[in-house]
Design a protein with these regions (language model features):
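Canonical Rossmann dinucleotide-binding motif of NAD(H)/NADP(H)-dependent dehydrogenases/reductases
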Residues: 2-34
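Substrate-binding pocket helix/loop in short-chain dehydrogenase/reductase
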Residues: 96-97, 101-109, 202, 206
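Active-site helix of classical SDR
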Residues: 120, 156, 164
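Alpha-helical segment proximal to the catalytic Tyr-Lys
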Residues: 125, 169-170, 234
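Residue(s) in the substrate-gating loop at a strand-loop-helix junction
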Residues: 140
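Short, small/polar-rich loop/turn modules that mediate ligand/substrate recognition or access, typified
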Residues: 172, 177, 236-238
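Short C-terminal tail/terminal secondary-structure segment
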Residues: 226, 233, 237-248
């Protein structure tokens, strides 16, 4: 175990979605890092910037409780503490409610509710013992409003939001902050393919659904997440914020 005066942050999937951008933001703000399955070249980039980095592989699937446990254990073994932790997980199931099956429901609950449950359970324990810490659960803006074509997904995301709020209420007296941010309409390959927005004409129609008239970038989203996990804002907990250009 190495002793450090720097804050230690965990990014559960540093190879997907906002993970790489979060890692870069945290490194720029003076953190040492624990990264799950980082993107190629990311570790060398962050170490060159001055961060110590612990890598954990094979932990992308947060539906497995051992994934979150391995990440948190790596932080405690390498650095002796864990100051902040962020994770994104999810399983999209689309279609009308009347055509859904119980298997659809179980699938979306596993990806959207059980996964953050396991992550919260693993991360909150050492933070309670430390008497401080920050956890950010990254979900979906569909948790904040009915979502035609994805009712089970929206409901499961709302469940994760309420889980976050309840955990936050339970551990606030221990100095631990727990918040959630939900995204939609992000400029990301998976979203572009799923929405058909790889076609410029379709993209224009998708962007027209966003009050701000465009898609969000990973870099600006990571910057928005900063105060929830970088130690600069210690008086906010139990909150859900939609990050979707005004859609929610």
């Amino acid at each position: 175990m190495s002793e450090t005066n720097r804050r230690v942050a965990l990014v559960a999937d540093a190879g997907f979605y906002v993970g790489p951008a979060l890692a870069r933001m945290l490194a720029a703000r003076g953190h040492d890092l624990v990264l799950g399955d980082p993107a190629d070249g990311l570790v060398a980039e962050l170490e060159a910037a001055g961060s110590s980095v612990e890598v954990v592989t094979g932990v992308r699937d947060l539906r497995l409780p051992e994934s979150a446990v391995a990440l948190v254990d790596a932080a405690l073994t390498r650095f002796g503490r864990l100051d902040s932790a962020a994770a994104f997980s999810g399983q999209i199931v689309t279609g009308r409610f009347v055509n859904s099956t119980i298997e659809d429901l179980r699938s979306v609950i596993s990806g959207c509710l059980e996964a953050p449950y396991h992550f919260l359970k693993a991360a909150v324990t050492p933070m309670i013992e430390q008497g401080e810490g920050q956890i950010l659960v990254i979900t979906s803006a569909s948790a904040a409003r009915p979502t035609p074509g994805a009712p089970l997904y929206s409901a499961a995301r709302a469940g994760a939001t309420m889980l976050t709020k309840n955990v936050a209420s339970e551990v606030a007296r221990n100095g631990v902050q727990v918040n959630a941010v939900g995204t939609n309409f992000m400029d990301f390959p998976e979203f572009l393919r799923a929405s058909g927005a790889t076609d410029p004409d379709v993209r224009a129609k998708v962007e027209a659904q966003v009050p701000l008239g465009r898609l969000g970038t990973m870099e600006e989203f990571a910057s928005f997440c900063g105060p929830f996990i970088d130690g600069t804002s210690r008086f906010t907990t139990g909150q859900f914020v939609a990050y979707a250009g005004g859609w929610a």
